Structure formats: C-alpha cells, structure tokens
Amino acid sequence: MRKTKIVCTMGPSTDKPGILRQLMENGMNVARFNFSHGDYEEHKGRYDKVRALSKELDLPIACMLDTKGPEIRLGEFKNGVEKLTTGQKFTLTSRSVEGTNEICSVTYKELPHDVKPGGRIMLDDGLIELHIDEVGDTDIVCTVCNDGIIKTKKGVNVPGVHLSMPYMSQRDTSDILFGVEQGFDLISASFARNAQDIMDIRHILDEHNSKIRIIAKIENQEGIDNIDEILTVADGIMVARGDMGVEIDFAEIPAIQKHLIDRAMSAGKICITATQMLDSMIVNPRPTRAEITDVANAIYDGTGAVMLSGETAAGKYPVEALKAMATIAETTEADSSFDSLVHHSGTDNSRLNISAAVGHAACTTATDIGASAIITASKSGETARLLSRFRPDTQIIAYVLDETTRCQLNVYRGVTPLLMDYATSTDELISMSVAKAKSAGLVQDGDLVVVTAGVPVGISGTTNMIKVHMVGDSLLAGVGIGSHNAKGEVCVCRNAAEAAKKFKPGQILVVPFTTNDMLPFMREAAGIITEEAGTNSHSAIVGLTLDKAVIVGATNATRTLKDGMTISMDCVRGVVQAMAK
C-alpha cells in the first residue's frame, strides 16, 4: 500500500466529465484549490463536487485552500502582451499607467521604497530578468537582461529583498473566511516568511472557531531562514519550488529541499513537495526520465506528500499524471534500500512526552514482530500524527469519530483514516477497530497488529497503551518453540503411515507426537503442532534444528483441527487461530 500521499490541483481539466472520479479512484488524497485564480463561484462548484463524490466513494479526500499570498504582479498592458529586448530600458511604476514595452505598473505601491539600484527584479517566474538602474519615489528604471515576452498580470519577484508589505491582505482574509464557511480541511499559506505570518492566519481561524490545519508554503529566503520557528506554529510545510527557484539560485534548490524536508521530519510535521514534478505531462502522456527521478528523490528525501499542479489543473493528461506519480511512489517505497534512506527518529534528539514515546515504541514493536498494521483510535487524530512522524514501514490504520479529522489525516504519510463509533472501554475499542480493519480488507485472520490508544478511553492526549493482537479467534493454545509464525492448510495425522498417504509439502502437520520416521514430513511442513508437551520433546528439538514453527502441548489438537482448515501459528504467543481461505 502506497504511503506517500498525492495532492492534485483542481482546474478546468478536472471539470471534464469523469476526470475527478478517476483521480479519486486512482489514488488522489488531497484536492488543492488555487485561489490565485478563479472566483468564489468557480471554487465552490468544484468544492461541492469533490465533497459529493468523495462521500459517494467513501474516500476521505482532504480539501486544501491555497492562498494568493503577498505576491506582486504587473498591471495591464495596452495590447495584453509586449516583447522586451536585451539592453532596452523598462520602467516599473507604482503609478497607474497603461502598460507598453517601456513601462508598466505594479500592484505593490511601496516597491520603489524597498529596492535599491544594483538589485534584480524577475518577471514571469524568472523568464525575464531586470537590472535596477535608478529608483525614484514611484518609478524603478531597469535594464532588460534577456529577450522575452511579457503579459498582463504576470508575477514579479525581488530576490534577496525584504518587502515591507503586510502578510495578510484583504483578499487573503476574505478567501480564508470563505474557506472556513465552506469547511475546507487545510490552508496552504503562500510566501510564509516567519512564525508571525502563520499566527496571523491562526488568529482568524481561532476567531471563527475553525480547526483548519495550516501548511506554510516556503518560497523565499526568509521562509528558509526561519523554517524552525515556522514549524513550531504551522501544522506542516510545502516545499514550493516555483517561486523559490526564482528568488534563490536554482543550483541551491536540491540542497534546500533536503534541508526543509529534514526539518519537517524532525518536527514531526507534514511535508509536501511541489511544483513542476511532472510538468511535461501537461502536454505529454508520459513523464521525462528527469521528472521520474525528481519525484523519487523527493520521496527518498522523506517527503510525506508530492503535488501535481498544472498537470491536473490544466493538463491534457491529468489521470495519467496521477497514475504515473502513484507508480513512481510505490516503486520507490518498494526499493530494498528505501527504509534505511528515509529512516528518521522523528524526535530531533529531544526528550519525548508519554504519548510520543508510546507511539515510537508502537512503531518499533510493529517492525520487530512483522506486524501487518498499527491500529490506533483517537478523538483528535493526534496519535496517528505521532505515529506518522516516525515513518514506520507498517501501515497505520487510524480510527476517528468525525469526517473532518478523517480528511485532515489523509495528508499524513502512511495513515489510512477510517470512521468508527465511540468505544466505551479498551476491550471494545480493540475488538471494534480490529473487526473494522478486517472488514475493510486491510488485515486478515492470522495477522499480527499493534494496537495503541489512550486509557481511559475517550480522553484526548492520553496515548499510553500498546497491545499486540492477532486477528481472528484462537482455536488452540500451547507452548511456542522459537519465534517463527506460520500460515497454511491443516493435515491431521495419527502416525507416519497416515502422513505418508495424505501429507502435502507446505501443509501444517498436526500430530499427537513426533518420531524419527516422521522426519521427512517435518522437513517439508510449514509448521508442526503436537499434543505432546515439553520443550525437550522430540518435536521441539527437531523443530528448532529445522528452523520450523512449532507449538507443543496443544491439548486436543488432533480433534479440534480438521484436514483442510486454514490456520495461523504464533509461536511467540503459542496460539493457533483460524483463517479465512
């Protein structure tokens, strides 16, 4: 099961009949709504479709509002587009003018007071570079450094300059309030520079009693420099490489990406890697080799999620792009070296609180015993977030009480969130959660699972219990020899002669006791169960020598177990359980 989550941006391509359904059915985890484009009516229409379809398919698709942020854009050009030539003069002004190939207005009126001669200004994601020659009260006179076509409303970046513009605009405030009203799960805060920027958004959410999670988009040098303070107040970060690649020397981006992902992992926070991951698939049905490697390397770096932007919003092949990204993620995670490359303590070498320590122990236990799943149930979903930070190889099945928490958890690496009714006791919680995981096809009879929760049940922030549990009902109990587990079909034999007639290699041999004439069958058995007790018995000694799963002292085993039954053997616990065929 893929653990890396995938974010898909909504747009005209996802509006086409059947596309949204295909995205959900093929692994989309988060729907991103880019508020730099479109109006409220357009966003609400798409939002309602996502919610309705995710309810129909019973999928916890999280909805993420991506703010416009404190960006600077060009004004209107008279002809909509102009050509700039290397060496020519071009003026940016805070005055309201009609744009030509000599002058254009900018949306940020204080820009002339923030820049100095000798600096650089980048237009349209860095496609055109301007050198600042002179700065006046309203005008910035520049020299064009390379030929290019410039269009109305294109972006303006000023590398290495602290802009005095306020973080929260009236537009962003209105957009966030719209998100609160609609019920969005996540907000990605564009151009986050420091902790205060995130707190400004948090203040608005708190005023409206909203539990929306905040993802800080790191897009400039200030955000990189202040990453640790941002992570203390944000729920996660997005490594937004688009504007970052304009603001910062492009050669530094790979190292910065690794650094940001590492800091997010250390803080135990969400990390999404974004921008141009499969950019060629906007027009082509297959990714380039470089793009495949880019996605894989982000996953090797430890990112919890990867994002598609124009590929799904406006591309010709949105479903193919999603499938390609999912395949790359699954293949990368299946690499034998993957676990060692992404292993991370998630603690940043600091002392853990009780809940985090229990979560860490649950992950370690699951790895040590080869558990099929870590199952957790919590009201707030915090336990699942704690488990995700430790990057276990085992899937995390998280039970929560409400749909909002379920959707918010769907952006966390390795977490499969499900709804469950309130449990009144620990025993009820374990039985309900294991039964639901089994009915969902996530575990099966005979699987070992690690269950972690809080005792007493129902109190948030009290994760303090771990239980190793085997799925299914116990048929027999005895003494396990060694630490192996086994699964297979039963063959009940009273003696070697009967075994010679009906035993097949790979079956579990069930006998009153063993003797030397049974050695050929014991060698080919998946496991051995005997009624005879004793760790020094023939079956125990031979089983250890052959490195087989053996349970001795299983009273009435030859009468309780029947030929053809499918069972599991847990030698650590000395338990035999029935399994569905």
Give the ranges of each region predicted by the language model.
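Feature captures the catalytic cores and cofactor-binding loops of soluble hydro-lyases/lyases
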Residues: G38-E42, R46, T394-Q395, Y399-L429, ...
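Acidic, glycine-rich flexible loop/linker segments
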Residues: P70-S169, K436, L442-A497, K502, ...
